[in-house]
Design a protein with these regions (language model features):
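Catalytic nucleophile loop
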Residues: 105-129
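Structured loop/turn residues at beta-strand edges in well-structured enzyme cores
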Residues: 74, 138, 174
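Ligand/cofactor pocket segment of small-molecule handling proteins
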Residues: 120-158, 163
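Amide-donor transfer/coupling interface in amidating biosynthetic enzymes
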Residues: 29, 35, 146-267
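N-terminal beta1-alpha1 cap of cysteine-dependent amidohydrolase-like domains
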Residues: 3-93, 97-110, 221-267
Length: 267
């Protein structure tokens, strides 16, 4: 089932960052954020850290291993769908169910964030295609992105280069705003109402990078991939900007709960 809507085309900038708090102050923020992971050992990384710093608890679920996704997000402040080694085009039942489920936060206008595979699943739910690069190139390492006018209006301070780990990309869904572009994979970030998709991985911690470059060392032999040592030398240069941008982005994204949701939570 594909979601259809006519979201407002005006990009509303994120508010200035709030200070980190031990506990959220408003009723909506007391609700946990749904975290969707795709491997037994996966973690929400820096995104989880940023949400916890704002006072949110995390409801972690792994549909691939039998965890059910909720029929509504009324009990959650928002949802994040992370990456994984599978494809959004895979025929597995859990992949199809997860893509179908994305209609729930879209319909309820809850904050939704897709990272890499999660962004591709969101794009598919919105009717866009997901496919490998025409020449077989991948992005594994740090690559430049270019924020669009809409992206700069939404959130300032975009990093010049960001971390990637993917071999597929997607078209910009109809009705979505392009927030950032790239070279080999043109769509790097987009917005559809309160839903956002990021093709790159600002969630990756230093420990995660060690695991990925060790267990996924064969990926670095693919066309376009960077050798393992460059992942760490470029991290030393670009990571601070990517982390600062992510913290601002997460704060602004999770604050986009619909007004009706806030009123219901306060009752």
């Amino acid at each position: 089932m594909l979601f259809r809507s006519d979201p407002a085309s005006v990009v509303v900038p994120f508010a200035s960052r709030r200070p980190a708090a031990a506990a959220p102050a408003d009723p909506v923020s007391r609700r946990p954020v749904l975290i969707v992971l795709h491997r037994e050992t996966s973690t929400p990384g820096r995104i989880g850290n940023a949400l916890r710093a704002l006072g949110y608890k995390l409801d972690i679920r792994r549909p691939r291993f039998g965890d059910a996704l909720p029929e509504t997000l009324e009990a959650h402040a928002g949802a994040v769908i992370f990456g994984g080694p599978m494809s959004a085009n895979d025929p597995d039942d859990y992949v199809r169910r997860e893509i179908d489920w994305i209609a729930v936060p879209l319909r309820e206008q809850r904050p939704l964030l897709g990272i890499c595979l999660g962004a591709q699943m969101l794009a598919r739910q919105l009717g866009a295609s997901v496919a490998p690069h025409a020449e077989g190139r991948v992005e594994v390492g740090y690559y430049p992105i270019r924020p669009t006018e809409a992206g700069r209006a939404l959130c300032p301070g975009w990093p010049a280069r960001v971390y990637h780990w993917h071999g597929e990309g997607f078209q910009l869904p109809d009705g979505a705003d392009l927030l950032a572009a790239g070279d080999d994979f043109p769509v790097q970030a987009f917005q559809f109402g309160n839903a956002f998709g990021l093709q790159f991985h600002p969630d990756v911690t230093y420990a995660m990078m060690h695991r990925w470059t060790t267990r996924g060392c064969l990926r670095m032999d693919q066309p376009g991939a960077q050798p393992g040592h460059r992942h760490f030398t470029e991290r030393a240069v670009h990571d601070a900007a990517e982390r600062a941008w992510l913290e601002h982005f997460i704060d602004g994204w999770i604050a986009r709960a619909p007004r009706t949701m806030m009123l219901q939570a306060a009752e």
